[in-house]
Amino acid sequence: IATAFLAAEPAMTQRLLRARKTLRAADADMRVPDPDQLADRLAEVLAVVYLVFNEGYLASAGRQPARRDLAAQAVSLTRLLHQLMPREPEVLGLLALLLLHESRAATRFDGWGRLVRLADQDRSRWNRELIAEANGLLDRALTQRASGPYQVQAAIAALHAEAPDYEHTDWRQIRILYDRLQELTPSPVVLLNRAVATRYVVGPEAALAETTPLGADLDGYRLFHALRAGLLAGLGRDDEAREASERALALAGNPAERELLARRLSF
C-alpha cells in the first residue's frame, strides 16, 4: 500500500491505524450500500480495486514477481461492479483497462521468469479476445461523453494494444491523453509517463528536461530513476545513466524488476 501511494511504510502504517480508529469510533456499518448510494462511493471502490490489480500485476515485494490470484480477483470484482452499474463510464473504463493489461499477461515474463519490457514482448501472443472485449467496453464508455481517469488510461492502453510494435505506437496521441489525465488527476507520476511519450515525439533531451522538475516528488520512486537512466544513456551520458540505474535498483523490491535493472547495469 505504501508503494502504491509513494509513501514511507511507517507513515502509511499510521494512516491505516488512524483510519481503523475512525471506523471503530463511528461504528461504521460494513455492508454493501444501497443502489442509490453506489455512485457516491464508487471512486474509492475503483481506486482500491485498481490498487489490488497493480499489486497482482507486479508485486511490490516478496519472492513472486506477480500475483496472478490478486490480478484475477481484481478483474472479477470489476466485472461484478459492471453488473451492478452497467452504464457507469468509469466502471467500463476500469474494466477495459484491466482487460487490456491482462491481454499481455502471457508475454510479460520469459521462460526463466525474467520480466520482459513492453517494447520486447511478442505481440502475436497477446490475447486478442480480451483486447476486443476491452475496446468494446471503452467505446461504450466514451460515447457517454463523461471523461474520467480510468477511461483515459484505458485509451492509452488501447493505443499500445493496436500498435504493430513499440516504436510505431501513436506516441503523439498518447502524449495528448496524458495531458488530459493530468487535468483530471494531477500527479507527478502522470507527468513521468508523459515524458516517455515525449521521448518518441520530441526526443530524449526534451523528455529528460520534463523529468528534472519531478525529482523532488519522485526521488524515492524507482521508475523515475529507471526512465532517467534510459534517457541519459541515449544521450551518451553514461556515468549519470549508471548512477540513475543504481538508484532505481536500490529502490526496486520486485525480484524480476531488480533482475531487469541489474541486466541494464551490466551493459
Regions found by a protein language model. Name each.
Residues 98, 158-159, 195-198, 227, ...:
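TPR/TPR-like alpha-solenoid helical repeat scaffolds
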Residues 132, 137-138, 169-178, 204-217, ...:
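Alpha-helical repeat scaffolds
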Residues 90, 149, 153, 189-190, ...:
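Start-of-helix register in tetratricopeptide repeats
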Residues 238-256:
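TPR/TPR-like (Sel1-like) alpha-helical repeat modules
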Residues 7-179:
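Amphipathic helix-loop-helix modules that constitute alpha-helical solenoid scaffolds
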Residues 83-84, 143-144, 180-184, 213-219, ...:
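Solenoid-like repeat scaffolds
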Residues 2:
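The alpha-helix within a helix-turn-helix
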